Regions:
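Alpha-helical transmembrane segments and their immediate interhelical/interface regions
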Residues: 35-50, 158-184, 223-251, 333-335, ...
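Hydrophobic transmembrane alpha-helices that form the pore/transport pathway of multi-pass ion
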Residues: 111-203, 366-407, 432
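Juxtamembrane and boundary regions of transmembrane helices in multi-pass small-molecule transporters
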Residues: 33, 171-174, 183-234, 393, ...
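Membrane-embedded alpha-helical segments and adjacent helix-loop junctions characteristic
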Residues: 59-149, 302-389
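C-terminal TM-helix exit segments that contain a strictly Trp-centered aromatic cap at the helix terminus
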Residues: 86, 90-91, 95, 211-217, ...
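A late C-terminal transmembrane helix in Major Facilitator Superfamily
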Residues: 405-417
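Hydrophobic transmembrane alpha-helices of multi-pass small-molecule transporters
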Residues: 1-82, 199-207, 216-324, 476-494
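Alpha-helical transmembrane segments in multi-pass membrane proteins
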Residues: 20, 24, 43, 47, ...
């Protein structure tokens, strides 16, 4: 969050603050649903311009609004750089045989009937261990997409399971940046914060796991599918080294992530190691490796479906995603700088009454900030900063708030295509969206764990279950009284 350097300027009225938000959402809706065109970039740029006009009407100078956009872009530069490095890493990990090896042995070891459930669990464990959903999606997740393709599982189902696991593991990892941010902005202990998320985390994970098991159990691998799996394995084994050497880049990246090395140097190290293994194993020269890193890996295995899976990666594959992120972040930065977001949140706070309203509003504010700003960090920091005093005022622990903003922030981020998280998922997993075919975006409702958690959180908010008083060490499992403004002892604690 940036510091407001113009404290004398008034916060815009709610009606004025909503103008750029409503018009931008309307423009996006017309473009996507009426004209069947999923290229939100220019609509977001127009939204930025409308926000600038609103700011100008309130006395903001252009350089104030510009600095707001640049500030958010500056904060997001590590995420943008991560996207670039992941594009480079994907191409060299395919060229080196790292991804093909994971796909090959995955086809050997994983049964199609429990592939989806296993994908979610594996990504959860990896993300929990290293604290990075993005690294998990870009490495293990990419291989799982390949395995699912061989099994005949639609890419949106595989992506839904990968996203569910990767972002859920990130949510409850003490190594995660968003987990630590949620704890820091609400002034709570990170381990207390993680424990307090279990009442929503466990049910959401269990429900998602059961759904994936049921769906996977209905998967029938017929003769044609068995033939395709055999073709995949034959193509992989005949074109790639499936020994121990291609595993080195993955092991090193996982180790660096576990020891909390920043994602960019960790992933760049993986890219370099992948390039070295590719050069050693397959005699690629320097120019070929650099071409892979820029334009993506290219190969012909005589199996079209395998070729489409392996011919990907490179910096150029991320340009659409990166520009989308930049437009969305600039729009969000302008909304924050002109205090439009603050105006909306303050208006919501004036209408909230009791714990039910407070907790529900906090979750929905995080979700809305994710949608409007495209920035997961802002979706955690803004409501965390603005709702915190209200929780303290009414005698509720800020652990309730930290749970709310994590659910509406971290978990919803990958479900919004123009958000940093959603853009990364789409770009990395190859979820191609073309006019008239939005099937790739079906991963959004199929990432069950990501949206079930905030839904369960809202249910708890409405019932008062698992609400925590500021002076209590345990959580209530009984409904809260809406009419009392003073903290009261809650019964039925566990």
């Amino acid at each position: 969050m940036q510091k407001d350097n113009t404290p004398n300027l008034a916060i815009p009225s709610l009606g004025l603050a909503l103008i750029p938000i409503i018009l931008t959402i309307a423009l996006l809706g017309v473009q996507i649903f009426y004209y069947d065109d999923f290229t939100p970039h220019i609509a977001l740029a127009i939204g930025f311009a409308i926000t600038a006009l609103v700011g100008w009407s309130q006395g903001y100078r252009w350089k104030d609004i510009e600095s707001g956009a640049f500030h958010v872009l500056h904060v997001a530069m590590p995420s943008i750089a991560t996207l670039i490095v992941v594009g480079m890493l994907v191409s060299t990990w395919i060229a080196s045989g790292t991804v093909p090896m994971l796909i090959f042995y995955g086809l050997e070891l994983i049964d199609p009937s429990w592939f989806l459930a296993a994908s979610m669990l594996l990504c959860s464990v990896v993300s929990l261990s290293i604290g990075s959903s993005w690294t998990t999606v870009g490495t293990v997740g990419l291989a799982l997409i390949g395995i699912g393709s061989a099994f005949g599982v639609p890419i949106y189902w595989s992506a839904g399971a990968v996203v569910s696991g990767a972002f859920f593991g990130d949510k409850i990892s003490p190594l995660s940046d968003t987990t630590n941010l949620a704890a820091a902005v609400t002034e709570t202990n990170v381990f207390d914060h993680i424990r307090n998320m279990m009442p929503t985390t466990i049910p959401a994970m269990v429900i998602a796991f059961v759904i994936y098991l049921i769906v996977g159990g209905q998967t029938d691998v017929d003769t044609a599918q068995l033939a395709q799996i055999a073709q995949f394995k034959e193509g992989l084994s005949s074109h790639f080294d499936l020994g121990i050497l291609p595993l080195i880049p993955l092991i090193v990246v996982m180790a660096l992530a576990f020891f909390k090395v920043s994602p960019i140097p960790a992933l760049f190290t993986g890219f370099i190691l992948g390039a070295i293994v590719a050069a050693v194993n397959y005699d690629y020269n320097l120019n070929q490796v650099l071409t892979f890193a820029h334009s993506g890996f290219k190969i012909s295995t005589d199996t079209a479906s395998l070729d489409s899976l392996l011919n990907r990666g490179g910096v150029s594959s991320m340009t659409w995603v990166i520009t989308l992120m930049m437009f969305a972040l600039a729009f969000g930065g302008a909304l924050e700088r002109t205090r439009c977001l603050e105006s909306v949140v303050r208006s919501i706070l004036r209408l909230t009454k009791g714990f039910r309203g407070l907790q529900t509003s906090a979750i929905l504010t995080s979700v809305a900030t994710n949608v409007v700003s495209g920035d997961v960090y802002l979706s955690i920091a803004l409501p965390g900063r603005m709702y915190g005093p209200e929780y303290s005022k009414h005698g509720y622990s800020r652990l309730n708030l930290s749970r709310a903003i994590e659910e509406g922030g971290t978990l919803v981020s990958p479900l919004i295509p123009w958000n940093a998280g959603g853009a990364f998922v789409i770009g990395t997993l190859g979820l191609t969206v073309v006019s008239g075919d939005y099937s790739a975006l079906l991963y959004i409702p199929l990432a069950f764990a990501c949206w079930l958690s905030p839904v369960i959180g809202i249910i708890y908010a409405q019932t008062g279950w698992f609400s925590k008083r500021s002076d209590e060490d345990v959580m209530s499992t009984q409904p809260d009284s809406e009419n009392s403004s003073q903290p009261q002892s809650l019964k039925g604690n566990i």
